[in-house]
A protein has these predicted regions:
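Phosphopantetheine-dependent thiolation modules in NRPS/PKS and related acyl-activating systems
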Residues: 1-37, 41-46, 51-52, 56-83
């Protein structure tokens, strides 16, 4: 499964998006774009990414830019997995 697909699956499961997750693209906005994507969802998504990839994400690595779009989050996840 590629990184974008993994991120979409995590978002689908975390935010209970159901079939709406299939419409997400790399350009789909997260912050301000999905009402379900609030501060608690950010924490849950980060935890699921850490568990899924076996990585640790430090607080200072996170910014609004990481969560701007599905693609920006997937790029961040890809970089963490490669490190």
């Amino acid at each position: 499964m590629d990184t974008l697909a993994r991120v979409k699956k995590i978002l689908r499961d975390t935010l209970n998006l159901g079939d709406r997750a299939e419409k997400l693209t790399a350009e789909s906005p997260l912050l301000g774009g999905l009402p379900e994507f609030d501060s608690m969802a950010v924490v849950t998504v980060v935890t699921m990414i850490e568990d899924d990839l076996g990585v640790t994400i430090e607080d200072d690595e996170l910014s609004a830019d990481v969560f701007a779009t599905v693609g920006s989050l997937a790029e961040f996840v890809s970089q963490k997995a490669a490190a």
